[in-house]
Amino acid sequence: LIRRLNTFELAIIAKPTKTFSELDKYFLDQYAMGGGHLMWFIDGVHAEMDSLSYGPDFLAYPTYFDLNITDLLFKYGVRVNTDLIQDVRCAGINDRRNVNPWVYFPLFGATNHPSVANLNAIKGEFSSSLDTLESTGIKKTALLQSSSNAKRVPAPHTVSLEALYNRPDPRSFNQRDLLSGVLLEGVFESAYANRIAPKTAGASLPQLKQSNPTSMAVFSDGDFIRNQVNLINPELPR
C-alpha cells in the first residue's frame, strides 16, 4: 500500500468519521516521510445543521479524539481543538423570512500566502480552532483566520436557534485571528521514529524516521473541501 501511495504527490484526508487504525496511521506517516504531501480536513466537534430539523437545539460534542490521530498531528506540530469558533463576521441562514447572521458559520479571512492569496472570505461550518506546537525544523504559516471579533466556545456545547435572533454583542467576541487553516513545511520527524511499526505493516520497505523536505496543510473544518455553489448569486456563500 505504501508503494501505491507513493505514486501520488498528494493525499487528502477529508472529514473522516471513523477511527484510524494504527496501520492506517503508519501508512500515512510513512507516505509523508517519503516526501508525500498531505491535506487534512478534520472536524474537532460533531455539529450538523440537519440536527435542527428535529428541534430548536442540539448538542455539539467532541469527536476529534475518537479519530485516533491526535498523536500524528501533535508530532507534526498542530492540534485540533474540541471547540467551536463563533465570529461576528459570519454567513447568514434563511429562516424563510429573513437572512440572519449565524455566528457558527464564520467567514474566514485568507492570508497572503500564495496558496490562498486573493481568495474571498471562506465560509466555515461549525469550525474548530487550531493551535500550533513547538516542532523543530517546521515552518508554520497561517492560511485561514477569524476576524478580530471572534471567540471560542468549548464542546460539549448546545447550539440553539435562539442565537439566530439574538444579535451578537461584539464586546463578548474579544478574540482575534483564531486559526482554522495552517501550512506546515520542512523536515518532519516520524510519529513512529521511536515506536515499533504495526506488525501487519510488513517489512517490504524500510521504516523511515525522518522525511525529505515536504509540506502538509491542516484545516479544522471537514466541510471546507465541499464544493458549494450559490446558484442564485455566486458572489455570496451558500
Language-model regions, residue ranges each:
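Acidic, S/T/G-rich, low-cysteine, solvent-exposed domains in lumenal/extracellular/periplasmic regions
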Residues: 1-238
